[in-house]
């Protein structure tokens, strides 16, 4: 077994105080996202999306956040993917944003709601053309005999859609994750980290400090 117990560091970039918290957690998330982007972090919109299968087995994968507002967090995916199939059976999900260089994390619990075709199409048409074509090519989470099969299909579809717009695949969609709780974590000295959790009660948010 590889021993990693001596890998550690101190957290000293600043604290998080109750008096500094807005009543709406999305306001704090917007501030932290802006600061993550301004710090030029690698993939600041990358989030870990966790779902659970019918046996209670959790699965995680990195997905890019594409939009957020007071209603929640939006991402897009292949509707035949494992994550989409699991969401169809159990729409309770969690999201996690690991902004390590800023010594920050944000964890979200909520329910995923499918977006309308109009909303999906609006975003799909903003994607680069090669990305639109790739959406047609990949049967996400299915087994492949070789990468060449995938590449061959890509170039075949690229030739097919050489002229004109790429249509939206019927098996491609998106989700809005409506949060029931959002936790903000800020690293602190001596492992005395600051953790605050916002919990939704109807239209109001309750704020609690959690022990590190």
UniProtKB/Swiss-Prot annotation:
It comes from Shewanella baltica (strain OS155 / ATCC BAA-1091). Belongs to the pyridoxamine 5'-phosphate oxidase family. This is Pyridoxine/pyridoxamine 5'-phosphate oxidase. PROSITE patterns: PYRIDOX_OXIDASE. Disulfide bonds: none annotated. Pfam families: PNP_phzG_C, PNPOx_N. Keywords: Flavoprotein, FMN, Oxidoreductase, Pyridoxine biosynthesis. It catalyses: pyridoxamine 5'-phosphate + O2 + H2O = pyridoxal 5'-phosphate + H2O2 + NH4(+); pyridoxine 5'-phosphate + O2 = pyridoxal 5'-phosphate + H2O2. One of its GO terms (molecular function) is FMN binding.
